[in-house]
Every structure is written in C-alpha cells, then in structure tokens.
Amino acid sequence: FAFVLIYSFSNQVHSDINFYGKINVSLEDVDSKDANETDFQNNASRIGVKGSYDLSSSLKLSFQIEEEIDPTDLRADGDKVFKERNTFIAISGDFGKLYTGTHDTAFKQSQLKVDLFNDTRADIKYILRGENRMNSFVGYVSPDLIDGLNISINSISQSTGNGESSAFNYSKNDIKASFAIEPVSYTHLRAHETTHD
C-alpha cells in the first residue's frame, strides 16, 4: 500500500534558463518476513536548473544542474543534503549531441520510460544491473540514421578503470524499442547512483 505525493514546479526566469523541481514522497506499508514497517519514502525528489544558448542557427549550447533532495529526512546525522543527479554541459547540432559531466548511461536510458515503478522501491534497478549514473562521463547521441532510429554511445575514465555503454534506440509513433550493451564491470566502476532513480 502506498500513498504518493508528487509536486512539480518550473519557473522560467529567462527565455532559455529554467529552475524546476519535483517532490515525490510515498507513505508505504511494507510487510516482510522480518518486520512490518510503515514510513514515508522519498522517491528521487529533486531540484535543478537548466538552460540553452544558440551559438548559431545550427549550433546550440545547453546545460543542466540537478540534485536529489530528501524532504522526509532532515539529515541531522550529517549525511549529504544533496545528491548529484544528471549534471552536464552539451553542444548539439546537425551532427547530433555531444555532452560531458555526470549522466545516466546509454543502457540506463534504454528503459524508454517503460519502468512503471521508476523511482520507487519496486524500481527495475533492483532486479536488473545497469542502472548506472556515472561521472567523468562523455556521451554522444546521433541524429536519426533512419526514420526514428539513433545511436547513443558513452564512456567514462576513472582511476578504477574505463568503461563504455551503447544503445540503438527506435521511436516512432507509438512504437519504441531499444537494444543496449553495457559491461557488467560498469557496475564496479560506478561513481554515483542515487537511492531511487
């Protein structure tokens, strides 16, 4: 059983810069073999700012800074109040989009919003490896190769090792499909993963 409260806001302070956020909290009753627990659960509530700037008629610079917040916990124990989510700078044009920073991998993005329980205790991340958000990240998304089909490629470089993730994504009308590949070792390279994402 769960009661979910979701509140979103977006405040446009300039033609190409937006402040936004979402509070997503559920009241959950969890019955397990060890105990029965009723508690408020934060489901990736967040705040952020994003914007874009036209460098030319065919070239755009964009950015996003996004942090997870937990309205159910005042963090009196000294834990971080904010947890970094997708935070990056990107340049896009006829060639596609090139971006760097902290971001979901191509494999993670290949969900294509089919995870109906995303951000909750029943998130697909608990049964499927590859729900990774990495820093030291460089990503590329191609323009459509054919109608509705593009490629996403990204890589990371860290002191613990390197990794790559790639996906073919198809989206047209009501049909969506994706084929993604990511080494299992990516999970061990993982630099950051939010509690529910």
Q: Which residue ranges define each predicted feature?
A:
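Active-site beta-loop-alpha junctions enriched in small/polar residues
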Residues: I156, E182-V184
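Conserved small/polar residues in nucleotide/adenosyl-binding loops
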Residues: T187-T194
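Conserved adenosyl
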Residues: G163
